[in-house]
């Protein structure tokens, strides 16, 4: 029986499951929104919010320059950075191909953005079934993520009504 065993297994062993969640978390932090299955999104939300909470609990210490911090605050910040870094990789690649320091993004950008917010940093939007295997898909994003920059919608030109075809007469 699996009483009091939280979390999903995803049909994987522990190391594969952990690697999958590490990569999903790194991609969510790098791109600020990703599309994945419902179950993975729900599990990813637990992991990502815990990492962001570690940074936000530092307050201003998380995004203040190192030189301005007291030795005690430097130690607190270093400890939090190492806790976050023990779970996610240091570097990620953004859509434009630039390298992103993921830990710095959590400690500086996200902690400043969510300062004073008691959790609930992500939103899961259901997208419907995936074509092919009918898996339920979701979009997981940070709640104040910038909107998706779509191409401006162009008004469709009205199509001229086609003349009705005249029935061909058969000679006979």
From Swiss-Prot:
GO MF annotations, alphabetized? structural constituent of ribosome
Q: Which UniProt keywords apply?
A: Ribonucleoprotein, Ribosomal protein
Task: Kindly name one Pfam family recorded for this protein.
Answer: Ribosomal_L17
Question: Where are the residues of the annotated region Disordered?
Answer: 153-172
Q: Which domain of life is it from?
A: Bacteria
Task: Name the SUPFAM superfamilies for this protein.
Answer: Prokaryotic ribosomal protein L17 (SSF64263)
UniProt xrefs under InterPro entries: Ribosomal_bL17, Ribosomal_bL17_sf
Gene Ontology CC annotations of this record: large ribosomal subunit
What are the recorded Gene Ontology BP terms? translation
What protein family does this chain belong to? Belongs to the bacterial ribosomal protein bL17 family.
Q: How does it assemble?
A: Part of the 50S ribosomal subunit. Contacts protein L32.
Q: Which PANTHER family match?
A: LARGE RIBOSOMAL SUBUNIT PROTEIN BL17M (PTHR14413:SF16), RIBOSOMAL PROTEIN L17 (PTHR14413)
This protein is called: Large ribosomal subunit protein bL17
Organism, as annotated: Sorangium cellulosum (strain So ce56)
Lineage summary: Bacteria, Pseudomonadati, Myxococcota, Polyangia, Polyangiales
| Name of the coding gene | rplQ
